[in-house]
Amino acid sequence: MGTPYTTDLIYDDLFTRLAAEHENFHYHTAISRETHHNGQPGQYVHHLLEKQMDTFDPLLSNPRTLLYICGLAGMQSGLFQVMAQHNIGDGYFTLKDQLADIAPSDWDLSQVRRGVKTTERCMVEVY
């Protein structure tokens, strides 16, 4: 779950408890506007995905996994970029021809909006 501040984490106690009680429930947070206790700057969800790809790759590679992206418009582009760079976008989105010859790291928000088409396994609600 990604939020600007730890105080914005909804259902944090519940998700933390579920993660402790169930080995198949995993709860990860990305806090963007707070410095971490180790002095590292905040991070967005796509930064967390990139840093912990070894953890997320098996989950995202599973054909039964569904992805729900909700939040500010623009944040989905970072997720799509990281997923495409690691070749785990298949099943979640397809690319239109206009993005075929552009490296995912070079995609901008307008290109993502026009050139990425999500599948039934990827729900996006952005505002």
PLM feature segments, named:
Residues 1-127:
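Reductase modules of NAD(P)H-dependent flavoproteins
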